[in-house]
From Swiss-Prot:
Tissue expr: Anthers.
Active-site residues from the entry: E135, E280
Annotated source species: Arabidopsis thaliana
Family: Belongs to the glycosyl hydrolase 17 family.
Stated role: Probable beta-1,3-glucanase that may be involved in the degradation of callose walls around the microspore tetrad during pollen development. May be required for pollen exine formation.
Keyword Transmembrane helix recorded: no
Record field: catalytic activity: Hydrolysis of (1->3)-beta-D-glucosidic linkages in (1->3)-beta-D-glucans
UniProt xrefs under InterPro entries: Glyco_hydro_17, Glyco_hydro_17_plant, Glycoside_hydrolase_SF, X8
Any one of the GO BP annotations: embryo development ending in seed dormancy
Gene null: resulting phenotype: Embryonic lethality due to division arrested at one-cell zygotic stage.
PROSITE patterns attached to this UniProt entry: GLYCOSYL_HYDROL_F17 (PS00587)
Protein name per Swiss-Prot or TrEMBL: Probable glucan endo-1,3-beta-glucosidase A6
Amino acid sequence: MSLLAFFLFTILVFSSSCCSATRFQGHRYMQRKTMLDLASKIGINYGRRGNNLPSPYQSINFIKSIKAGHVKLYDADPESLTLLSQTNLYVTITVPNHQITALSSNQTIADEWVRTNILPYYPQTQIRFVLVGNEILSYNSGNVSVNLVPAMRKIVNSLRLHGIHNIKVGTPLAMDSLRSSFPPSNGTFREEITGPVMLPLLKFLNGTNSYFFLNVHPYFRWSRNPMNTSLDFALFQGHSTYTDPQTGLVYRNLLDQMLDSVLFAMTKLGYPHMRLAISETGWPNFGDIDETGANILNAATYNRNLIKKMSASPPIGTPSRPGLPIPTFVFSLFNENQKSGSGTQRHWGILHPDGSPIYDVDFTGQTPLTGFNPLPKPTNNVPYKGQVWCVPVEGANETELEETLRMACAQSNTTCAALAPGRECYEPVSIYWHASYALNSYWAQFRNQSIQCFFNGLAHETTTNPGNDRCKFPSVTL
């Protein structure tokens, strides 16, 4: 009997082990399948900071027309989420930065957020990611940053309470979360955020099988020093390579360098297998005169090559993680004319507000790169050298110009001195002329303090001198 019992026990243990191994393999297979599915659907960022943008209904139809597979919202807009229930699009929603502290403080508040922003729409609306905040570590917001992971954890708790397990929670970070990123193997997170934020964040993401979301823009890395990095290398079309001296890994584009620097930074903190997702990447189609390389051809080239790379089957991954599926969101659907900052901030879109393309792009990645209509060659791929002025845009509203004129002249005794009666720029006496001088003078005087030639859309830069023999407009020399 004892021999028989031992025999039966052995069979039971063996079969149990086999079943456990089979279940584990099945779980791993389903995880991999989900990762491949998410990565195969190239997404689009749908921002709405513009006064000329179409309705959510029209915008979602435009998203379907470009064959995007996933849409990322910068909020949880009820109208958009309702409309998206009638599509096959995967959806990502965002918790605004200002709500993070409240969510972190109380599970009830997080439960209410989920009850309001997810439960009425899910699963008919195929929500796949909830992103808590946006680039929260790029701002000097210590209290908010330490509340980041607790807020994420409470949202996951609420999702689990409702039996929802396939919505992943993450947070998009920018490249400035790194202290060093070159060469890629030198990637290291900033010391002041490593202990308080990064380690808890990575532990949370790893424990929930979520992704490290990254807003990564090779344009800014390249444009800061365009003479040191080939434009073709930044646009995925160069034959040049870079070899990391520490690892021997060979890089053929700038994006892979930047992604691997983050992967190496996570490895140094003990997370070598963390999933990676690109929450924003793109290239501006226009910018200020000193924003070299911001043009339609470069934007089209970058995004077409990006989609080709990221939609490849099997996945290409990066030199340090070959074969890694990376869910990717192109930035962005429209130009957003109410964004502040330099000109490029308002010009990342692929569509005009009427839905017509700024340039053609195929989000399935199936169109060969030679299959698109030719685009005009740019003239700003090398830095501009010369004088620049700031003048009102054609058709600028006179009432708004007058208000901005008063603001500019109030900032300094010298800004508008030449506009005093009898002075060299007093005539002709008109709001447009006086505003032209005042805005330009103010911009030239304070440009080194990050004043932009924008003034809520009233002004733009020009290389044509707006002054005359009597009235000399101050200029900025690039």
